[in-house]
Amino acid sequence: MFQLKSAYQPAGDQPKAIAQISEAFDQGKKKITLLGATGTGKTFTMANIIQKVQQPTLVISHNKTLAAQLATEFKAFFPDNAVHYFVSYFDYYQPESYLPSSGTYIEKEATINDEIEMYRLATMASLLSRKDVIVVASASSLYGLGQSRFFEENCLQLYVGKKYDFNDLKRQLLHMQYKPIHGKIEKGMFEMRGDILEIFSSTERCLYRCFFDEEFLERIEMRDAQSYELKAPVQKAMIRPATQYLQDVSDLETILQQMDAEKELRIKEFEKMGMSIEAERIKKKVEYDIRMIRETWFVNGIENYSLYFDQRLPGQPPNTIFDYFPEDFLMIIDESHMTIPQLRAMAQGDRARKNNLIRYGFRLPSAIDHRPLRFEELEAVLGWKPLDQVALDEAAADLELVSSAHQQVLATQTEKEQKSDSSLLNREARKSNQHAVLAQKVKKDAKSIFLSATPAEYELELSEQVVEQIIRPTGLLDPITFVYPKSGDYQLLLDSLPKLLQKKPQLSTFLEEEPEQSATLPNFEELFGDE
């Protein structure tokens, strides 16, 4: 699978660190901290570990820029394997929010980076089709995605020599959120011209030009998406969905009925509290959304109804990139002292914002469950803590926020459960409490490495072993540095002159950088003469 290619060999403390981490994994340890000084080549050490464990790998960094740098480095180390960049695809993002103090409603605004969206879709496609995958992600990986099973099942496979119905192809492409070409050609579009079907891939920089003889697929050409230059004729083409949030709409009417039922009960709840403005607000909002979803299978903000589309219970964790990984994968937390606090804070900020939207009638209470994975849930999924030791207090707090209207909808579904297998809760197929659902998501054989020059107390206590990497491959040492207060710095310089006079090059550099201050030093010429 993984084949590391590099002109360098491990040096300094790298061989020792690689051996110790590998041995720890062989002994069954799953949580390790690599305490590596700056400049010791921790990324190269991780590349060697990836080659040794031969498992799909997820690397999480605390910002996009560092993640991009790491992805570039890993691509250089593993040119023959799938290395992906998985970060937020927004160039600009203003979340939907409401400020009660000023009565200001801020509508969601976002500018999507098509290139990064393609990277994300390609990541999901690779994880479902191969094992030699390295994903470099940011903290946004905690946010929800479409169900991995549904994403995989809704791929269009085209084979030369097979018979296809054009109307069925068009219907399936539309369902996969591909759009007919109107004006500007972009990824995730398709065009039918006579007996030719062109599909602009959502996961690759190419288009597939399919030639039909009546209903038989005669030839497939893979072409460059910009120049249209022929890359190669192919015998088959795998077309992946054009969105990462593809929803199961096979029982759409039931989902819409559930949304409408929650809306009606929420209206009654507002009216009972004398909140007529909020009641009218939520009525108009949900009715418009239902109409759009029924007609187009989509509406802006559809993610706020993910509880219904995903058939989840309140408080249950969302589907994330972790669901696309197998049970035996390698997790690397880069700069863990910075990244872990970010992972911990993601859900808290999201919940505070949703609170106002729900209380003032801009969203249904079920919107609280469109959220990132909580840190406590992440601990359980990755096996950092046993499930019975994971605190899920915030999930209980969410249930307090969920209105009695929403709870009545859930109660109604409970009564219907014995009569229907397609209920919101789908009780026979899913567990009805958060612990049980988390248990289904736990990656029992996952391994975790925390990388940091200054690991925090959390990862040090969590780790079963701490490996040090101090000596650089170059053998260079850090210079001994003394830090003094700014006040009295020139007096300190004067007091240090006997030693500094023996190191004139360093002293002259200081004087060149600070000419005005150095000119005020007493007896300057007497001390230094003409030098």
Model-derived regions, located:
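ASCE RecA-like P-loop NTPase motor cores
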Residues: 1-531
